[in-house]
From Swiss-Prot:
EC number: 3.4.22.-
Listed name of the protein: Cysteine protease ATG4A
GO molecular function: cysteine-type endopeptidase activity; cysteine-type peptidase activity; protein-phosphatidylethanolamide deconjugating activity
One GO biological process term: aggrephagy
Purpose of the protein: Cysteine protease that plays a key role in autophagy by mediating both proteolytic activation and delipidation of ATG8 family proteins. The protease activity is required for proteolytic activation of ATG8 family proteins: cleaves the C-terminal amino acid of ATG8 proteins to reveal a C-terminal glycine. Exposure of the glycine at the C-terminus is essential for ATG8 proteins conjugation to phosphatidylethanolamine (PE) and insertion to membranes, which is necessary for autophagy. Preferred substrate is GABARAPL2 followed by MAP1LC3A and GABARAP.
Subunit structure: Interacts with ATG9A; the interaction is direct.
Keyword Lipid metabolism: yes
Organismal lineage: Eukaryota, Metazoa, Chordata, Craniata, Vertebrata
Organism per entry: Bos taurus
Domain notes: The LIR motif (LC3-interacting region) is required for the interaction with the ATG8 family proteins. Required for proteolytic activation and delipidation of ATG8 proteins.
GO (cellular component) term, any one: cytoplasm
Length: 398
């Protein structure tokens, strides 16, 4: 009996207690691009939040690297937040933003496959093992705390080995998103066998137009766009607050990574000037697949009251996430950014059409030549030499 209780520790299923955490207000709550009216849609809000995959500290998994830690308690919170953001992208990719999880009901096979990407085993492509060991290539020792930018770089590199989800991961640099580079990456990486990879972007675009409306979609690799930012020096500059909140309203929103120094949260929305977040700082026991090949998912959804914090208490180091399944989604995102973000006198980030001339040439990332495939390749830190270290992002002018 004690083992059963331990398995489901920290799970609170009394919905009334959950909803009492929200004030009685006419204000809208925004969660990852969807709005909820508290007075009339509290149960829908609850369902929407609890449907997000929730990754927390775990214990009793196999030692990382064979001899490393068997728990990430105290150091893995930003890695868990990165997992949550990526998992939301995969849910949108395979099941759609409107899909909802229901407790103790059979879930789609795609859902189970997504969940298994994140189990705490070295053979799972986005496990704590893979992320921690890939972090060595970013200058982070196993067991060391990661910042938002480091997690973004790790996800970008691990995604190269994930053939099933087939994501193009773009991490902006110098607070600048380059439209030309993203379209080059997403189109090039998903070309059909009869389309030469070396064809220029203009030629590819013309070819797609001649083939009809469906060709453009089939030539687009789903995009995970991560924008690391520093919105101040020691604290967030209030001038960025409105633009930051606007990002949670965008249909492409995957929320934000951030929190406080050495204390990471996954921000999924806001109410007024309070950010709503999922907190990874709960230590649960490692969950593995069962005999039927599925994993018990009851501890991977947060049924506790959602936590909130005033946006001005946020550490200025953050990373915004967006998912664009099709090219039209990215085009729509660009329009929203131009309308809501670039209108500010002090812009949170820049969106430019062309690759800056003073930057090195853009080369779409490619999987290194290694002797194994998939997640198994990162069995030791020596195999990380194929990757170049990424520089940290710059501080925005304030």
């Amino acid at each position: 009996m004690e083992s059963v209780l331990s398995k489901y520790e920290n799970q609170i299923t009394i919905f009334a207690d959950y909803l009492e955490e929200f004030p009685d207000t006419d204000e809208l709550v925004w969660i990852l691009g969807k709005q909820h009216l508290l007075k009339t849609e509290k149960s829908k809000l609850l369902s929407d939040i609890s449907a997000r995959l929730w990754f927390t500290y775990r214990r009793k998994f196999s030692p990382i690297g064979g001899t490393g830690p068997s728990s990430d308690a105290g150091w893995g919170c930003m890695l868990r937040c990165g997992q949550m953001m990526l998992a939301q992208a995969l849910i949108c990719r395979h099941l759609g933003r409107d899909w909802n999880w229901e407790k103790q009901k059979e879930q789609p096979k795609e859902y189970q496959r997504i969940l298994q990407c994140f189990l705490d085993r070295k053979d799972c492509c986005y496990s704590i093992h893979q992320m921690a060991q890939m972090g060595v290539g970013e200058g982070k020792s196993i067991g060391e705390w990661f910042g938002p930018n480091t997690v973004a770089q790790v996800l970008k590199k691990l995604a190269l080995f994930d053939e099933w989800n087939s994501l193009a991961v773009y991490v902006s640099m110098d607070n600048t998103v380059v439209i030309e580079d993203i379209k080059k990456m997403c189109r090039t990486l998903s070309l059909s066998a009869d389309t030469p990879a070396e064809r220029p972007l203009e030629s590819l675009t013309a070819s797609n137009q001649s083939k009809g409306p469906s060709a453009c979609c089939t030539a687009w690799k789903p995009l995970l766009l991560i924008v690391p930012l520093r919105l101040g020096i020691n604290q967030i500059n209030p001038v960025y607050v409105d633009a930051f909140k606007e990002c949670f309203k965008m249909p492409q929103s995957l929320g934000a990574l951030g929190g406080k120094p050495n204390n990471a949260y996954y921000f999924i929305g806001f109410l007024g000037d309070e950010l709503i977040f999922l907190d990874p700082h709960t230590t649960q026991t490692f969950v593995d697949t069962e005999e039927n090949g599925t994993a018990d998912d009851q501890t991977f959804h947060c049924l506790q009251p959602p936590q909130r914090m005033n946006i001005l208490n946020l550490d200025p180091s953050v990373a915004l996430g967006f998912f664009c399944k099709e090219e039209k989604d990215f085009d729509s995102w660009c329009s929203l950014v131009q309308k809501e973000i670039l209108k500010e006198n002090l812009r949170m980030f820049e969106l430019v059409q062309k690759h800056p001339s003073h930057w090195p040439p853009f080369v779409p990332p490619a999987k290194p030549e290694v002797t194994t495939t998939g997640a198994e390749f990162i069995d030791s830190t020596e195999q990380l030499e194929e990757f170049d270290l990424e520089e940290d992002f710059e501080i925005l002018s304030i």
